[in-house]
Structures are given as structure tokens and as C-alpha cells.
């Protein structure tokens, strides 16, 4: 897809790149990440390298370091986007905004609410098989339990996203 973008447009500025990348390339890189999130370093690097190469399409940014290119293009690392997506889905599940019963994935830890935590902490269970430690229901627990009360009790998904993004930046 990146090759097609390169040969289809003679000169791509950062605004055009953002529109093309966000509509054509990024959806392919983020397809079904809650079901299959890469956990091997080689897979994570491989996906990130696609974005790294894609950001070099903008001629003015070719000689700038990758983290700086991301800031200029208002992009984030794919791993950060996957984590954000996991947190949004967890929020939606726990608040009944999905047609899936969250109890199939999580158990609320009602007995361990303290001043540093929040009221919707999840119990952490060890997986029976090593391969299961990368499943959605296991990989989100630590990150979710580390969120603030303000984030977890957001009144809507949009408010949760805004509060999560504010806390992460």
C-alpha cells in the first residue's frame, strides 16, 4: 500500500500523508489487534518498521529522527495505539457498552479498593498455559489496574479516551 501511495503522488506534504496513511495504511496495521496483538519483539519491530518507512514518504521529514517525525505528523507508536485500544475495549466491556458479558474475560477485585487505586480493579489470575499470558484478558489487567479513578469512572467512551490520552501525555 505504501508503494502505491509513493508512485501515485509526486509530492506528498505532511497533511496529505496523514490523510492517506490514516485511511489506507494504519487500518491494515491495526486490524483485529485486540484479538491478536503481537507479543514477540520481532513482530512488534516488523509492524513498527512499516510505519517508520511510511513516515519517510514526506520529503521534508526524511532526515529527521523517527520519534520527531511522529510528533510532527501527530502519530503515535503502534504499540501505544494497541495499548490504548485495549484500554478502550476494557472500559466498554466493564461498562456494558458491548454485547459481551465482561465476566467471560474479567473478575472484579471488589475487596482491594484503596486510596491509590480505583473502584474497578480487576483480579489477576495466572494463565494455565504459557501461550495464554498474551491473551487480551491477561495482558490488560496490570495496565487497567494502574489507571486513575478519574479515568475509570468516565461517563462516556469519549470522555475515557480524553482522560486516558491526557494521563498518558
Q: Where do the language-model regions lie?
A:
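Hydrophobic/basic alpha-helical segments
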Residues: 1-169
